[in-house]
Design a protein with these regions (language model features):
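Short hydrophobic/aromatic, small-residue-rich stretches within specific transmembrane helices
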Residues: 22-26, 52, 149-153, 174-175, ...
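Helix-turn-helix DNA-binding module
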Residues: 133
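Transmembrane alpha-helices of multi-pass small-molecule transport proteins
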Residues: 21-36
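Juxtamembrane transmembrane-helix boundary motif
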Residues: 2-10, 15-16, 35-121, 136-137, ...
Length: 222
């Protein structure tokens, strides 16, 4: 989520180029994280592919529709997504969602489409939407939902970036460099998460999201 503000503020990329670049980088780095979860047995591929396919359709359409939406509207939507992610992190996992037996696959796939649409349009992963959908409609335990969501997000990000490529220019060398740096960073983050309390990390990241969201709003409208 924080990659887009960096691309906008530090690298000064145009809004739609930043969103397209973010999706490509996310597709690559999420695959790396997904492989680690898969080796630990936390990825249910059948469920992930079913959700991911409907999400890909929505994400590709979202990427195409972004061509007709003004950058300020897209940034406003991205800010809302950041704030929603921050709220979800602050809430934590107070309520454990019990996986449903006989989960409604068809309903889950229907949910995947609008989730992908929003993610593809705004250049974000939408993990805070995917994980609950996998637990409620996919019948997965929380640990499996988190791992499987990485597969869904990777599929959505790939499709969304293809949708953006029809109307946005992307520097593939920059994508490769950012993906490499973030892949290494994710490994460091995994080590850090084992040494620092999860609740503290959630609050810290949520505060960072809120601060960056406010900064983006100020830059966009003032």
């Amino acid at each position: 989520v924080l990659l887009v503000p960096v691309l906008l503020s530090v690298l000064k990329l145009p809004t739609k180029t930043a969103l397209a670049t973010s999706q490509m980088v996310m597709a690559a780095t999420t695959v790396v994280a997904m492989v680690l979860h898969a080796r630990a047995g936390r990825v249910v591929f059948r469920t992930g592919v079913l959700f991911g396919l409907s999400g890909m359709a929505g994400s590709f359409l979202g990427g195409r529709l972004a061509h007709y939406i003004s950058p300020s509207v897209l940034l406003s939507g991205f800010v809302v997504l950041m704030l929603a992610s921050a709220i979800q992190m602050l809430r934590g996992s107070r309520k454990k969602t019990a996986p449903k037996s006989g989960a409604a696959w068809w309903l889950g796939m229907l949910v995947g489409f609008p989730t992908g649409l929003v993610a593809g349009m705004l250049g974000a992963g939408g993990g805070f939407l995917v994980v609950p959908a996998l637990t409620i409609f996919g019948g997965l335990a929380m640990e499996q939902a988190v791992g499987t969501s990485l597969l869904v997000i990777a599929m959505q990000a790939f499709a969304g970036s293809l949708g953006y490529l029809g109307h946005s220019t992307v520097d593939f060398r920059l994508v490769g460099m950012l993906a490499s740096v973030m892949a290494v960073g994710s490994l460091g983050g995994a080590v850090l998460s084992q040494r620092v309390p999860a609740a503290f990390l959630r609050r810290l990241f949520a505060a960072l999201l809120i601060a960056v969201a406010i900064q983006m709003l100020v830059q966009t409208f003032f």
